Every structure is written in C-alpha cells, then in structure tokens.
Curated annotation (Swiss-Prot):
Part of the ABC transporter complex ThiBPQ involved in thiamine import. Responsible for energy coupling to the transport system. The lineage of its organism: Bacteria, Pseudomonadati, Pseudomonadota, Gammaproteobacteria, Enterobacterales. This is Thiamine import ATP-binding protein ThiQ. The complex is composed of two ATP-binding proteins (ThiQ), two transmembrane proteins (ThiP) and a solute-binding protein (ThiB). It is found in: Cell inner membrane.
Amino acid sequence: MLKLTDITWLYHHLPMRFSLTVERGEQVAILGPSGAGKSTLLNLIAGFLTPASGSLTIDGVDHTTMPPSRRPVSMLFQENNLFSHLTVAQNIGLGLNPGLKLNAVQQGKMHAIARQMGIDNLMARLPGELSGGQRQRVALARCLVREQPILLLDEPFSALDPALRQEMLTLVSTSCQQQKMTLLMVSHSVEDAARIATRSVVVADGRIAWQGMTNELLSGKASASALLGITG
C-alpha cells in the first residue's frame, strides 16, 4: 500500500535514508531517540519535504514529487493548527471544503464525525473555549472527515495527561479500523505504541534501525530495545 524505497533527505548535507513498506489498514508506531529522523520520515510521506532521491508509492502510484494537497494522506501534529476565529464546525468543515461551502452530504459527514469524536455538542464554540483534549478531538475530526486512506500522527497527544492520552489513542485506533485507514504514529512512548500498534519501526541516525513486533521491543529482547532505554 505504502512503499518507500531509499527515500533520501539531506539534512545539513548528511543523508537521512528510509526504506519501508506498510500494508493497507496496518497501524505502525515510529519510535526512536530525539532528533533521530522520526518527524522527517512522516514529512517525507506527507510531501512537506522533497526527497533528494528515492521513490515513494501509494497503491502503486508514484507520489515521490507529488505536492501535499494531492497526496491521499492526512496528518495531525502536536500543535492542532485550529483557526481561533472559526467555530468547531467550521474548523472541521475545512477538511471537506476550504471555502466552507458544504453540501448536504458533506454536512452529514461533518456531523457524523463530530458525534464519533464526542464533540457534537461543541460545534458552535471557538477553539479558545475548549480544553486541550477537546481541541485535539476537533483536529482529529478534521483529519478523519477527509476520508484519506493514510493517517499520520506526529505526537499529537504528548501534552495530554496519561488517562486522556490513552483515551485519544483508543479513539484513533477504533476510527482507523472503522474507516480501514493505514496509521503511522510517531511517539516517544513504547507503552503508547503498544496500545494501538502491533508493529513498530525504530529510527536512529536517519535510518530505520529496526522493525518488528512492538511487544518484542517492550520485553527488552529486541536489538533496538536499548536505543529506547528498555532493558530485559
């Protein structure tokens, strides 16, 4: 479904190079030390960075140089990027039409995803009137309403308390299963990864140093466990 072949990004003339295959509907965690290249990997997939070489295909179609707006990808960041002067409904609606001129079908999709996120009673509010968790639900709803086959998460819940973070991770996992979306999630927490991703990829020094079962990483028996400070 998603295939990266020697996708290379030059960071201060030092190459970060990634090869990775992710199947449709798979939920994969991307782990590794700070500065290892995790966010760079997601940005290359999303199209926010243009690779120096290599190829990226989605469903067999070459997207290596495709602009972000034409890629079948949605991405959620730690900063939710909500527009403070727009209501919750309008912020979600941007995922369907940048001009916010929604037809009846689009209106129905918007309200359905709001109910799924548990924010249907907040549609008339502004982002400044919401809690941090509620704002991230709105941002997630805006991603999901686009119905793109790939969802990228760059630590969007790291600022939330543990209980709320677990709640959001469960919500993401359930939503991806319902929509048959492929999920790649950057995280610093192997425990968070284990909640939703059976497979993990460990990035170190701009390379994929290891990939395999998340539980193996948690056990401390994987060759990359030490990179994450996990001992058996």
